[in-house]
Every structure is written in C-alpha cells, then in structure tokens.
Amino acid sequence: LTAVSGDGGETWNAVEQQEALPDPECQSHVLRTRWREKDVYLFSNPESETSRVRGTVKFSSDGTDTWTSKRLLEPGEFGYSCMTQLPDGQIGILYEGSDITQYFAKFPVEWVLGASPE
C-alpha cells in the first residue's frame, strides 16, 4: 500500500495497492538517493504477501513508476528495514532477521542492478 504527499506530508493522496510491491503488512522502506548524477529510489521489504521472508531490495530510476531491478538480500526471515546512503556512497540497511535480531549490511547501488561497481 502506498500514499504520496506533494507538500511535505501535510496532505496525502488516496492509499493504493502496488502490484509490483507485494508486502505481508510489514514496515518497508523507500530511499531516494543520488546515483550517477540523478535521483533514484531503492525499496526494501519482505517480498511476500503472507510471510516476513525474502528480504528484497528494488530499484527505480523513474520516480517509482516502475521497479526495473531487484536483488534478494536475505532469503530467510526479514522484518522491519531502514536504508541510508553511507559516506562512501554505498547503501547501508538495518533489518530485523530471525529471532528479532537486528542485522546490518551494505552494498553499492550496482549490486541491486546485478552488476559490479565500476
């Protein structure tokens, strides 16, 4: 489910189901970041409609209209997640794994695209 605000969160449009972003009603995260001199978006969540499993990161370069690439970060349990861009340009992600344990991983944006960093 998504809703969009164009005024800094004062008002929101109607909530919509996003077929490209299956979710078992678990907090997900969208990160807007700079990559190759343009704004891109990364989305992290458990990619399942029924279980908190398959922690996946998806990539959009068109303002979240489409999600053109994705990579599986964690095949097992995956709950709440939060991403940030680190000082070295990589993406850091903190997520809930098995037994409510917190895990941290980092990766370059190219990893989500299935490519090696240049």
How should each PLM-predicted stretch be described?
Residues L1-E118:
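Asp-box/BNR beta-propeller blade signature and adjacent active/binding-site loops
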